[in-house]
Amino acid sequence: MKVAIIGGGLAGLTAAAYLSKDPTVEGVLFERSPQLGGRAFTYEKAGFTLNYGAHAVYGIDRHEITVMERELGLTFHSKQVDKRQVMYAKHDQLTPAPLDFVNLMRTELLNPRQKVRFVGEITAIIAHIHNIKNYSTLGEYLAQSNADEDVKELWEHLVCSNFFITPEEARKVPGPVISEYYHNLFLSNRPVNYILGSWAVITNQLREKIDLSGRWELALQEAVESVNYAERQFVLKTKHRELRFDRVVFAMPVQQIGKLLKGSPWEPFMVPYESNTATEVMVYDIGLKRVVARPFSYISDMDNKLFISDVSATDHTLVPEGGQLLQGIAYLSDGFADEEERKAYLDSKTKQMEALFDHYYPGWREETAVKRVSKKAMVASVKNIATNRLLPTRIDHVPFYFCGDGCVGKGELAERAFSSARQVAKAILEDMKLSCVGN
C-alpha cells in the first residue's frame, strides 16, 4: 500500500512514523517548507534554542506523548516546572498559582471559604461527577453557578492559561471539553513539564524512524497542488511530478485543506469547517547574555492576560553558559473593525509585555543577545470553542484521513496533533487488514 501524507508538522511526522513500522506500507510525506516540524520547528541563534511557541507539555504522565514514547521507542527527558515558582499577579500583588493543594492553601486569590469551594470543584472534576460537563460552555456554567466572582475568575484564568485564549473566548469552551481536560490535568502527578532540548528532540526522532524504514520519502519544499481520483487511485500533483497513492492523509490546517480541495467533488464536505478560527498569540522571546533576575519560573499577569516563562530556569540546555531565555506570551482578541484598530491593539500588547519584562527582569534590554517577536503566532489551527468545529479524522463520503491540532482527538494543542495522527495511522493499518481479508 502506498500512502501520501500532506504536511510535515507534528501530526504528519507522527502518522508517518507509525505507518513506517509496517513493512507493507510505503509512502511520501510532502512538506511545502524547507524544514519539518511545522509550528514545532526549532532553530538556534547565538547559542539559544528557539521554538515557534512553547514546548511545555501539560500532564505528561497522562499525555499521548508518553504512549508514543512506548509504542515508537522514543527517548527523551523532561523536567517539571517547579510548582512553587509559578506565580500569578493581580492588581500588582504576587501570589502562588493554585496548581496543587499546597499552592492553593498559600494563594491569596481566594479566601478560606472560596478555597474550600474550589477544592470541592477540583474533587468533582477528578471523580467525573462535576456537572460542568452537562453545560454547553464554561460561560453557561459560570452564569448559573453560585460561586463567588473570584472563583469564577480563577476558572476563566485557568482555561486562558491552558488553552492560550482570552477570557471572552474561555467562556466559549464546551463544558465536556473542560471536564475531560481538567480530569486528566488534576490527576496528573506532573502537571507542567518541558521536553529537555525542545521539540527538536521529538521531531528528529520521528524523522529518524521514518528514514530508517527505507520505504518513505520526505519531500521537502514540495507543495501538493491538486488531488484527484482516477483508476482506483489518488493522483497527487506537485510542481514537478505526478504520483499515485492508495490512501491520502491531510496533516495540515483545515483552512489549507479547503483551498486544496476547492473545485473538487469533496469541496462541499469541507464547508462546515471553513469558518473555523485559529488560536493565535503574541510571542516575545528574549535571549539574555546573563541571568538578570530569577524571581520565579513563570509569572501570569491576570489583569492584562499575558505571561512570561523563564524557560531556561527549567531547561538549561536551551541557552549558552550563563544565559537566560525568557518567553512572553499574550492572549489575543479577535474581531477588529479594521486593520488600524488591530495594529493599535497589537502595539498596546507589545508595550504591556515589555512593561512586564521591565518590572520583573530589570536590565533585560541591555543584556539582550537575541530577540524575536511574533505579533500573531498560531498556537492551534482551530480554537476549541463552541462556535468552531473540530475536523473528524474521517468524514462520511470523503475518502481521506485527517489529523492535526484542529482535528478531533485527545487533549489540546500538540497532544491533539499526536493523538489524531496515531488514530489515523492505526485506522489505515486496520483498513488495510480488512481489505486483505476481503480479497
Predicted regions located by residue number:
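Mobile amphipathic helical/loop "lid" adjacent to a hydrophobic cofactor/ligand pocket
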Residues: 69, 73-172
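Conserved flavin/dinucleotide-binding core of flavoenzymes
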Residues: 311, 317-439
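Conserved Rossmann-like nucleotide-cofactor binding loop
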Residues: 11, 35, 255
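Mid-domain catalytic core of redox enzymes
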Residues: 223-326
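Helical element adjacent to the flavin cofactor pocket in flavoenzyme catalytic cores
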Residues: 180-238
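N-terminal Rossmann-like FAD-binding beta1-loop-alpha1 element of flavoenzymes
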Residues: 2-29
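Glycine-rich FAD pyrophosphate-binding loop
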Residues: 20-44
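Conserved FAD-binding subdomain of flavin-dependent enzymes
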Residues: 35, 42, 47-80, 127-130
